[in-house]
């Protein structure tokens, strides 16, 4: 708990928490503005109202979420790398793996808050603007959970990368390259491409149905835990040079 409290203070100071809160607010605002401007066009699409609400608005929200994750993870080790502080932590009564786990938990919780803010906006739109009886809260909750879960491999992967490179431009470049390659591959039906975390985060955005894909969700969970385990192992056994 002490490590978590210290990390919370650090992430407030280096801007990680404000970045993810801003992502949630901007995503919610985008949903409102987009639906207001395109309401008639969206509701006339040959899709079920809930599919329109969730899949047609999620694309840009996903981009905001992705770059919010990339920026936050690039910033999260900034304080540790200043003055090579992270190298000295091994001589202090501080657990570097515990610090890594706390950073992961803080990122996860704050990203979940962002997802909740965005989906509160979608719920408001659904209750107010969809045809009577068309809004389904259960469908919204399932899609929100699905979009959160499919984003977690990128968060876990980017934290792993950021923890190993002192120059934040390296993980930032990897994040941008991952996004571009994910965009190019997301529409492919080849299951092997699901090993690419940036393909997984794009799956809800390119789907025409709001129903979660259980295969994608399972792979997302496995990748998230795998990247987390690798990051914890490196933090414990691979000291910073």
Model-derived segments and spans:
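Secretory targeting signals
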Residues: 24-71, 101-165, 206-211, 215-219
């Amino acid at each position: 708990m002490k490590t978590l409290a210290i990390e919370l203070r650090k992430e407030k100071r280096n801007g990680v928490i404000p970045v993810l809160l801003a992502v949630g607010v901007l995503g919610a605002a985008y949903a409102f503005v987009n639906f207001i401007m395109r309401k008639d066009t969206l509701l006339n699409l040959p899709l079920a109202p809930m599919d329109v609400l969730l899949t047609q608005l999620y694309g840009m929200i996903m981009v905001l979420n992705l770059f919010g994750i990339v920026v936050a993870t690039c910033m999260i080790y900034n304080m540790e790398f200043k003055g090579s502080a992270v190298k000295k932590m091994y001589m202090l009564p501080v657990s570097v793996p515990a610090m890594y786990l706390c950073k992961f938990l803080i990122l996860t919780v704050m990203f979940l808050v962002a997802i909740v803010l965005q989906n509160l906006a979608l719920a408001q739109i659904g209750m107010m603007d969809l045809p009577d009886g068309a809004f389904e809260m259960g469908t919204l909750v399932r899609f929100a959970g699905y979009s959160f879960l499919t984003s977690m491999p990128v968060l876990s992967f980017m934290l792993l990368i950021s923890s190993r490179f002192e120059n934040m431009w390296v993980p930032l470049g990897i994040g941008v390259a991952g996004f571009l390659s994910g965009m190019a591959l997301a529409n492919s039906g080849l299951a092997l491409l699901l090993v690419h975390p940036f393909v997984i985060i794009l799956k809800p955005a390119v789907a025409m149905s709001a129903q979660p894909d259980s295969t994608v969700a399972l792979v997302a969970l496995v990748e998230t835990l795998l990247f987390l385990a690798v990051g914890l192992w490196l933090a414990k056994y691979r000291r910073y040079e």
